[in-house]
């Protein structure tokens, strides 16, 4: 019994000594561990080596929280048939283009699931909200647009982006891995 206790105490001391010596080596060498990838919300500009703490944002859902309540179609008292597109500002192609939600109630949150959970980078993204003309009589109406940087403005799994006129709010939900 005493031998088992002594071995346990010795094991704890060896582990503690090993852990403290690693920390001491880092402090003595002047190296700072951290995430060195600017596309991670855990990025540290003072890190001198990557210690494996990087995580990245992957989009899960797009949410239209509010938008201007006006008649977008030729018929009176018809709610908008909404769809949204999202892309990196520097890109010519859309990374997400939603299906159309017909007669969307402006007082109800509209949600689109991301068909593929692509990584959101530390760049400016733009979104555009449209009213689809059903049946297609003329071009779809541009309702609102906005921009966001998910790494800079993401908080607790959500990026909130407001249109330039402040009447439309889009939320991009993400998970970290």
Q: Which ranges hold each PLM region?
A:
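Sec-dependent bacterial lipoprotein signal peptides
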Residues: 1-20
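Bacterial Sec-dependent N-terminal signal peptides
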Residues: 15-44, 48-58
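Solvent-exposed strand-loop boundary residues in beta-sheet-rich modules
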Residues: 39, 88-92, 133-135
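Short amphipathic, basic-aromatic surface patches that mediate peripheral association
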Residues: 57-76
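Short, ordered, surface-exposed loop/turn motifs in non-cytosolic proteins
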Residues: 74-88
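Eukaryotic beta-sheet cores, primarily in C2 and C2-like/PH beta-sandwich modules
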Residues: 84, 111-147
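Tryptophan-paired
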Residues: 87-123
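C2-type phospholipid-binding modules
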Residues: 131-177
């Amino acid at each position: 019994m005493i031998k088992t206790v002594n071995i346990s105490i010795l094991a704890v001391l060896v582990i503690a000594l090993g852990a403290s010596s690693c920390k001491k080596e880092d402090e003595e060498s002047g190296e700072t561990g951290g995430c060195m990838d600017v596309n991670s919300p855990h990025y540290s500009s003072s890190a001198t080596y990557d210690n494996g703490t990087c995580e990245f944002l992957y989009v899960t859902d797009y949410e239209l929280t509010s938008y201007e309540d006006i008649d977008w179609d030729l018929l009176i008292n018809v709610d908008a048939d909404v769809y949204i597109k999202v892309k990196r500002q520097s890109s010519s192609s859309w990374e997400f283009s939603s299906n159309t939600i017909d007669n969307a109630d402006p007082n109800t949150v509209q949600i689109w699931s991301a068909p593929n959970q692509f990584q959101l980078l530390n760049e400016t993204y733009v979104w555009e909200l449209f009213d689809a003309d059903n049946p297609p009589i003329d071009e779809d109406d541009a309702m609102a647009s906005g921009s966001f940087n998910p790494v800079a403005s993401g908080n607790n799994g959500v990026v909130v982006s407001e249109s330039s006129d402040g009447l439309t709010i889009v939320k991009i939900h993400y998970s970290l891995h």
